[in-house]
From Swiss-Prot:
It comes from the Eukaryota. This is ATP synthase subunit a. It is a multi-pass membrane protein. F-type ATPases have 2 components, CF(1) - the catalytic core - and CF(0) - the membrane proton channel. CF(1) has five subunits: alpha(3), beta(3), gamma(1), delta(1), epsilon(1). CF(0) has three main subunits: a, b and c. The keyword Repressor does not apply. CDD domains: ATP-synt_Fo_a_6. Keywords: ATP synthesis, CF(0), Hydrogen ion transport, Ion transport, Membrane, Mitochondrion, Mitochondrion inner membrane, Transmembrane, Transmembrane helix, Transport. One of its GO terms (molecular function) is proton-transporting ATP synthase activity, rotational mechanism. GO terms for cellular component: mitochondrial inner membrane; proton-transporting ATP synthase complex. Belongs to the ATPase A chain family. It is found in: Mitochondrion inner membrane. Mitochondrial membrane ATP synthase (F(1)F(0) ATP synthase or Complex V) produces ATP from ADP in the presence of a proton gradient across the membrane which is generated by electron transport complexes of the respiratory chain. F-type ATPases consist of two structural domains, F(1) - containing the extramembraneous catalytic core and F(0) - containing the membrane proton channel, linked together by a central stalk and a peripheral stalk. During catalysis, ATP synthesis in the catalytic domain of F(1) is coupled via a rotary mechanism of the central stalk subunits to proton translocation. Its main location: mitochondrion.
Length: 120
């Protein structure tokens, strides 16, 4: 049927996309990304209906989604890497004197990624 083909095509598209990034861990992350994609896609499709609006046009929804993804990234990073996750804030090749200042800038930019993502 048409709906089965539509669903299976969407399923395969998302699976192949995730597989290209997370080869051996696709099955672990697939449900999260699949339902996130469906939620955003279907929420935006509701906006096509006359006299309705998309819930993704509201800042509280987009901020909540980006904050959820940001926290999931942080928690998974600490779970997988432990304290070595903090190494993402260190940039190789900068003078030793600038390391604390640069790390502070990196932490602030990492925190504000969710805000920037929600404002898109």
């Amino acid at each position: 049927s048409f709906f089965y083909s539509l669903f299976k095509g969407t399923y395969n598209f998302i699976y192949v996309t995730i597989y290209s990034y997370l080869v051996d861990r696709t099955k672990m992350f697939f449900p999260f990304f699949f339902y996130l994609f469906l939620f955003i896609c279907l929420s935006n499709l509701v906006g096509i209906v006359p006299f309705s609006f998309t819930i993704t046009s509201h800042l509280n929804i987009t901020f909540s989604l980006s904050f959820l993804v940001w926290w999931a990234t942080c928690l998974l990073g600490f779970y997988e890497s432990g304290l070595a996750f903090i190494a993402i804030f260190y940039v190789k090749g900068i003078p030793f004197v600038l390391v604390p200042f640069w790390a502070l800038i990196e932490v602030i930019s990492f925190i504000f990624r969710s805000v920037g993502l929600s404002l898109r």
